Structure formats: C-alpha cells, structure tokens
Amino acid sequence: DYDGTIRYSWTLDQLAAATELPAGPEHDGLVFQEWNWSLENLKATNRKMNVGATYTTDDGTTRVYIHLQEGRTSPMMGLGVNGTVTVDWGDGTTPDTLTGTSVSTTVWTPTHEYAAPGDYVIRLTVDGTMGFVGTSTSNQYSCILRYSSSTDARNTVYRNAVRKIEIGNGVTSIGASAFQACYTLAYITMPKSLTSIGSYTFNGCFLLASITIPDSVTSIGNSAFTSCYTLASITIPDSVTSISGYAFYFCNTLASITIPDSVTSIGSSTFQNCNTLASITIPDSVTSIGSSAFNGCYTLAYITISDSVTSIGDSAFKACNTLASITIPDSVTSIGSSAFNGCYTLAYITMPKSLTSIGNYAFQNCYPLASITIPDSVTSIGASAFQACNTLASITIPDSVTSIGSSAFQNCYSIRYFDFTNHTAVPTLSNTNAFTGIPADCEIRVPAALYDEWIAATNWSTYASQIVAV
C-alpha cells in the first residue's frame, strides 16, 4: 500500500492460478483506482515483483497536509497551471485562484496569512491540468509551500511544514525538484493520470518511507529519490522504460527492489550507497549497467545479470562488500574501471568468452579471489586490474592479451606462477611495477622460444630472475 503495508503476498504458483487481482484497499478520503501491474503482465513476468495500489481523492481535489510553526504562518504556493486552480487554504478564508497556460510554468499565490499555527489541509481544485514544480536552486527547491518565490532561507521552514500529499484530478506531471528538500514529507498518493516524474522530484524527502508509481509513468528522472533515507518500499510498474542516474542514490533503507522487464537501462549511480540492498535481479531487457550503479551497496550479496547486458560500467559494483560470487554473461564485452574494486568477499567470478578488455582497478582489493580464468578474447588488462588480490594462487594469461597495465598484479602475495606459455609474442608491459610485491619464488612462465626476447623486453627485464622458460 502507499504507506508500505503489505496487503497480500502470493507465491508464483498462486499467481499462475489467479484469475483476478485482489480487491483494492480502502482508506477514508481516497478512492482505489487500480494496482500498478495487470494480472496478465505479472504472469508474463513470472518472478518476484512488488505491486502497489494507486488512488485518487474522493472529491477530486488535491490535498496538501501541513503543520505550521509559531511565527511561521505566512506561506505562499507555486504551481504549474494550464487552466485554473482554486486554492482553499483550509482555514475558512476566501480561496485564491491561479490561472496559467502551462503545467511547467510556475504561477504563485499571494502570501496567505494564517491566524494561528497548527495543522491545516490545503485543497486544490483543478479546472484543466496542473503540475507540481520546483527549482534546484539552494534555499528555493520545491514550490509547494514557501515564504518567498525567490531565494530565502525561510523557505526551508515552509517546505518542512508539508507532511502528506494526496493527489486528485487533473494533475499530469510532477516536475523537476517538485518536492525536493521537503524533509518531513512522509506520505504521498499518486493517481494514474500522472505521466512523468522529473529529476530531483523527491530528492531529500528524508521521511518518505514508501511510494507507488502509477502505471501511466514511463520514466524516473535523474536523482528522483536521492537521499530518501527512510525509503524502504517502492513499486515500479512495467510502464517504466528507463531509470535515470542517481535515481535511488543514498536510499539507505531500501532493502529490495524489483526492476520490471520494460526497463532497458540502469543509469549511473542509480543505486549507489543503497547500504541495505541485499539482492537484485536485472531483467533481460536491460542492456547496460551504468557507472557506479551499485557502488557502495555494502550488503548486496546476490545479483543476477541477464544475458542481454553488453557492458558493465566503471565502479558498477565497487565496494559491494558482501558480494561473494558473480557470473558475468557471455553478452558482456567490457568490464569498466573499478567495476568490482573493493569487493572484499568476492571469491568466485566467471568471465564471459566475449570479453575484450578488463578495465583499470577492475578487481583491485578482491582479497579472497583465489582463481580466475581470463578468456582468450581479452586483449588488454588494465592498470591495477588485480592489484592486492591477496589469495590469487595462479593465473593463465591467454595469447590474445597484448598489453598489461601498471600495477596490474601488484601485491598479489599468494601467487605461485603466471602462465604465458601459450603466447606467440611478448606482450607490452606498461610499467616495471606491474608485478611488484609478488613472492620471490613466483614464476613467470613463458615459451622457451621467446625466453631471450622476454627477459630483454622493456620493463620485463626487471623480472628476469623470475621468468622461466617452459
């Protein structure tokens, strides 16, 4: 439900047998519209999925619940209006009327003077269409409730007066920064008339614990839920095709999320620093995982990457400290820089045969990684790619590898040998520190026919005493 309450829970067998979805929840003042997934699409997906209820208000008005402090009783409101919006301030005074021609252009009410602090419900009646609007400028942000239409530190007090929003008829968009820095906004219901959620929309809504996105929404904007520290539940419908960068950045309480099959890309830093995210399945529709997408997801222990993914971005899984194993599908051709850097418990990884490059720092500080097979499609090993893989015992470098970056195997303290015996040419060694810190008895095994050339080659000569002809 919109407040995070689990109303029903089905197994996949129960889903397969179902002929209709359950009845919607009932709430005073709200009218259930629909679940944000259809039964048909749930059955087609046939995997774990969170489903949420969408509502409109029983009288069609949009309600903004506020709590005003002593000495802070003079707010104004900015809205995007295409037509007219009547603003009933909830204190028995004469309503204000706003007129406009665009849901993305802000129209301001006059300053309203409340007679006393306390709790009020502002009701917005829309004739036409309306959007919520904001700006990313410091000391402005959301226009939902402010002291001034321009920059003023007192705007923060009024934004923080907003506690709950129930969206009614006529609202089609929640624009960029629409509720940004509404620190005490704890609940919101959104109807199926909504078509877009803009960038920074809920950025910094610290108390927002749960949200249901209607199935009319197709995209989640950049940083839309950044720093929603208590957001524990979100239901994404299969109408959403893209989740932009930083969308859930620093959502520290988000323990699980289901990505629908409609999503084709996961943007940069989308789930970065979601510290309690424990597992995630990336659907077949996703073709790319952006840089730092799961960086700092310390409790991420399980992830399934579909065979539609072709690239894993820089730092994509960096510092996923609980990730013990991962299989990279054959569709992936590149692993970005620092992709798995600092995955301290990563002991097993399967690399695809399609892989052509291993980026800089890709597996740096993967301390328990004991073995790895580099496919013969790889042509380059980046700088510090396996630096400080302290448990790595041996590795075979295929003939396809033509260059090895600086510090690539530095401080691999347990390694017994490097196998280059299938090489037909000496690969380029970028720096003399490529093997710094390996044990004194570690062998660099090379073909006997190339031995003399190998020990004389640039930077390889540093390790002449450890190069062994086989």
Language model regions located:
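Extracellular/surface recognition and adhesion modules
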Residues: 1, 32-35, 53, 87, ...
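Secondary-structure capping and domain/repeat boundary segments
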Residues: 1-58, 126, 141, 145
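Structural signature of tandem-repeat unit edges
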Residues: 8-14, 41, 121-127, 158-173, ...
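Solvent-exposed serine/threonine-rich low-complexity stretches and specific carbohydrate-binding patches
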Residues: 10-13, 95-104
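Short proline/glycine-enriched turn/loop motifs at strand-loop junctions of beta-rich domains
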Residues: 26-31, 79-85
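Extracellular ectodomain segments of secreted/surface proteins
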Residues: 56-80, 127-167
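Residue-level recognition of secondary-structure-to-loop junctions
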Residues: 102-116, 120
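Consensus positions within tandem repeat domains that build extended binding/scaffold surfaces
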Residues: 175-180, 198-206, 221-226, 244-249, ...
